[in-house]
Each structure stands twice: as structure tokens, then as C-alpha cells.
Amino acid sequence: MDLFKLFSGKPSSKEVAKDRLKLILIHDRSSIAPELLEVMKSDILKVISKYVIIDDDEVEVRLTKTEEVDASSPALIASIPIKKMKQR
């Protein structure tokens, strides 16, 4: 057992590959093209940037699915680290 990996908090390459495969499957099933997702991400960041200073390098926007009782539907998840609020 590698104790460094246990406490580093970084996902293994196996976990990264698994997550990427899940994203590919979700994109395929939701019929939202990756290009459209990038355009949506860009538009969202433009609007948010009017009000706050964000960390562009750490922004993560992904498509996932919701777990509903009768069916699952696509959901857009955004993690946008805010550095500070802009003065208005």
C-alpha cells in the first residue's frame, strides 16, 4: 500500500479514466455536442465575470445525469472558484 497516494488526495489514473468514460457516455446519451458544451461554458463564464473575478485555470463545467425516480436526465454541473467580488 502506498501511503503517499492514500493521503495525497489525487485520484489514480484508473479513477481519472473511469470518470472520463462516464463523461463520454453521458455526452453520447444526452445528445449535447461537446462543442455546444464549450460554448455554454464560455457564455456562463462571461456572465459570471461581470460580477466576480474567477480562477480560469480551475473552472470545471461538466455534464452529468440526475438520479430521479422515474428516469435520469442530464444536468450541467459547474465548479467556478471565485477569487474576489468586483466593486460595483
Curated annotation (Swiss-Prot):
Alphabetic keyword roster: Cell cycle, Cell division
Keyword Cell inner membrane: no
Any Pfam family matching the protein: MinE
Keyword Cell division tagged: yes
Any one biological process term the GO annotation gives: cell division
Database matches in InterPro entries: MinE, MinE_sf
Function, in words: Prevents the cell division inhibition by proteins MinC and MinD at internal division sites while permitting inhibition at polar sites. This ensures cell division at the proper site by restricting the formation of a division septum at the midpoint of the long axis of the cell.
HAMAP family per UniProt: MinE
Protein family membership: Belongs to the MinE family.
Record protein name field: Cell division topological specificity factor
Lineage start: Bacteria, Bacillati, Bacillota, Clostridia, Eubacteriales
Gene expressing this chain: minE
